[in-house]
Amino acid sequence: MPLFRHPNDNNMLPFFVLVISTLALRALGAAGLLPLDSWALCLRGGLALMFLFTASAHWGKRRRDLIAMVPRVFPRPDLMVSVTGVLEIFGALGLLIPMTAAAAAVCLALLLLALFPANVRAARENLTIGGRPATPLPLRALLQLVFISALIIAAFPGDLRRAAQ
């Protein structure tokens, strides 16, 4: 199974939302919008936009596909999809509040780990999302790693900078 199926594949949309929004926020900071003069703050903003984007699927036309991804051991997969969507929204908002940003980032990273079995099921059972094949497992694992890494960087930017010195 190829990592990418074709150029129009939407597997990368959350990644693109993260990268483009982070860079756009940083460009605004470079243009003089002082609250956005830090990469860490712009990354938190990009992550917040990404999680709001992904949360929207929990109630949109992809909802049935997300419900089908929930591992069978969980009762009420419809409720699980709704709850995880709400958690993504709260986490996104928490990333934007300095006092809660680190905790929100850690909680979202844990949420991504908890949701990974649904992605495994979708890939192994050849489920579809929005009428398209689910993300191949190697790409999904790589994306999860990128998202979790971004959350860790957003949660502890000063600690990572000191560790690198």
Feature annotation, model-predicted:
Residues 2-165:
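Membrane-interface extramembranous regions
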